[in-house]
């Protein structure tokens, strides 16, 4: 591309127009794959997104209102028990301690204070203690099911991967959403 532009700047206008028409036909054929509505559910996609106003209509912004998304995997369909077990196995193999937390609201808000850096909803209620020394996902899944029995009707439940050497949360994903 750079060599074509450089050669077009040096040559006569006739040669430049010939070079640009050759390149524009190639560019059009490349951009022909960028069509809006190629993926299924076009009408649903358009109701939840907004266009950025440019001619490339496939770049859109996700509508943030009345369309809550919570954690890392919340854009996917609800995870099956096997998928949850694989995610928890990854947390355990990474050397992180699985933790289970629950919360009624499930989102980060700013209601209690307007100070910079203050947000409500960052800290959820912990279910029991972090599972330090846990070696299998089955025990974590049992604890999740026990938490669902008590709080599943009205609370969001998430699983964390906590790195106790760095004292940070390394992974977090929703494992249960309440029926609204």
Curated annotation (Swiss-Prot):
SUPFAM superfamilies: RuBisCO, small subunit. It is found in: Plastid, Chloroplast. One of its GO terms (biological process) is photorespiration. Keywords: Calvin cycle, Carbon dioxide fixation, Chloroplast, Photorespiration, Photosynthesis, Plastid, Transit peptide. InterPro entries: RuBisCO_ssu (IPR024681), RuBisCO_ssu_dom (IPR000894), RuBisCO_ssu_sf (IPR036385). Its main location: plastid. GO terms for cellular component: chloroplast. The basic functional RuBisCO is composed of a large chain homodimer in a 'head-to-tail' conformation. In form I RuBisCO this homodimer is arranged in a barrel-like tetramer with the small subunits forming a tetrameric 'cap' on each end of the 'barrel'. RuBisCO catalyzes two reactions: the carboxylation of D-ribulose 1,5-bisphosphate, the primary event in carbon dioxide fixation, as well as the oxidative fragmentation of the pentose substrate. Both reactions occur simultaneously and in competition at the same active site. Although the small subunit is not catalytic it is essential for maximal activity. Heterohexadecamer of 8 large and 8 small subunits. Belongs to the RuBisCO small chain family. This is Ribulose bisphosphate carboxylase small subunit, chloroplastic. The lineage of its organism: Eukaryota, Viridiplantae, Streptophyta, Embryophyta, Marchantiophyta.
